[in-house]
């Protein structure tokens, strides 16, 4: 699939630059990307700001942490661009998942101050994040918790999604799976749907093995219906032939289950063929099977999956209606990329922010055009 370069951003602390390599920050990168209707939203946690840009890279708005930029360490913008800057008055640390809806509302996961963290009743799950919500013109900035506006903090937020009905879906990591919080357009909770490895359907083993291990890799909402798509990866134990002792586990299958949000019932699963690669070494050939990661679902019902390869990314798209499978490859020179983050739009466009040693490039691949040609 052909890559389309859109624009690039330099490194630094000016308004149209990204700070990815801050020396006073520890841990992983805190910069994420979202794209909706041709507009890009980049949360740059290292610089405590959110950029809103068009597809040419023109800065439309910049939302900044008031505490961070008011500390004297960072300067405010020049008078010529001051109208684009909007304050975030909450003491949150930016740098999590980000999404936008059709109204151009921005949602991003934030960490709250440690003294405001909470725990569940059993004390084994930390509630430490909220979702910052910003209206299209920046006039309204508030936050969403488990119950809605100003609610209890979430567990760790792995993904944020918005539907075509402008409803926010928050995916959180739990001790035994994932949990989906489905919010109405006004931000109040409609459904809370925990998906544990204990209630995901098991599969029968053709090897007569009773111990089957399952992980819930991701949950993606339908764009219109009250339906979640739950991707489960299944593993079987590996047994040493000589000692007859379990030596590990190996991947066997991936299934995506439609889950009715209203009654919690699982539907008939869709099989996700694994990524397969052959490696020849010392006159022997090894066949590797890897599970794809669930990237998202389009408005017309195509599920998109992705896995990293040596030469880029392998993409697999499956129609929820016809079950047709389409595979493509995205060419990326990983040796030149220091950091990347991907986004998938409801239209079927795959976007990426690719950071090398000189700049961060924003590109996309028009998978939506491929899907349109298949539907005709």
What are the functions of these language-model segments?
Residues 1-376:
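Eukaryotic scaffold repeat domains enriched in small/polar residues
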């Amino acid at each position: 699939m052909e890559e389309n370069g859109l624009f690039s951003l330099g490194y630094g602390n000016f308004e149209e630059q990204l700070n990815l390599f801050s020396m006073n920050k520890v841990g992983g990168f805190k910069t994420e990307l979202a794209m909706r209707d041709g507009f890009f939203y980049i949360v740059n946690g290292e610089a405590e700001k959110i950029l809103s840009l068009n597809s040419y890279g023109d800065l439309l708005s910049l939302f900044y942490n008031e505490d961070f930029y008011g500390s004297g360490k960072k300067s405010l913008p020049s008078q010529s661009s001051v109208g684009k800057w909007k304050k975030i008055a909450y003491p949150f640390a930016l740098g999590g998942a980000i999404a936008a809806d059709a109204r151009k509302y921005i949602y991003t996961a934030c960490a709250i101050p440690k003294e405001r963290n909470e725990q569940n009743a059993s004390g084994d799950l930390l509630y430490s994040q909220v979702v910052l919500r910003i209206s299209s013109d920046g006039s309204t900035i508030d936050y969403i918790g488990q119950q809605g506006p100003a609610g209890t903090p979430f567990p760790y937020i792995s993904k944020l999604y918005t539907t075509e009905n402008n409803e926010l879906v928050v995916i959180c990591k739990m001790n035994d799976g994932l949990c989906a919080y489905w919010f109405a357009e006004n931000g109040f909770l409609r459904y809370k749907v925990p998906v544990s490895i204990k209630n995901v359907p098991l599969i029968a083993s053709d090897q007569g093995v009773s111990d089957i291990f399952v992980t819930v890799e991701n949950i993606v909402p339908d764009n219109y219906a009250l339906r979640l798509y739950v991707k489960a990866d299944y593993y079987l134990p590996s047994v040493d032939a000589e000692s007859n002792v379990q030596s590990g586990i190996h991947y066997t299958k991936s299934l995506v289950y439609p889950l009715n949000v209203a009654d919690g019932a699982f539907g008939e699963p869709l099989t996700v063929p694994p990524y397969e690669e052959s490696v020849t070494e010392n006159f022997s050939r090894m066949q590797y099977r890897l599970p794809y990661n669930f990237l998202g679902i389009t408005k017309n019902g195509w599920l998109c999956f992705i896995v990293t390869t040596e030469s880029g990314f392998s993409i697999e798209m499956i129609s929820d209606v016809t079950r047709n499978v389409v595979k493509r490859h995205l060419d990326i020179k990983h040796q030149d990329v220091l950091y990347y983050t991907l986004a998938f739009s409801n239209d079927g466009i795959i976007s990426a922010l690719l950071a090398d040693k000189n700049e961060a490039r924003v590109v996309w691949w028009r998978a939506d055009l491929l899907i349109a040609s298949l539907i005709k």
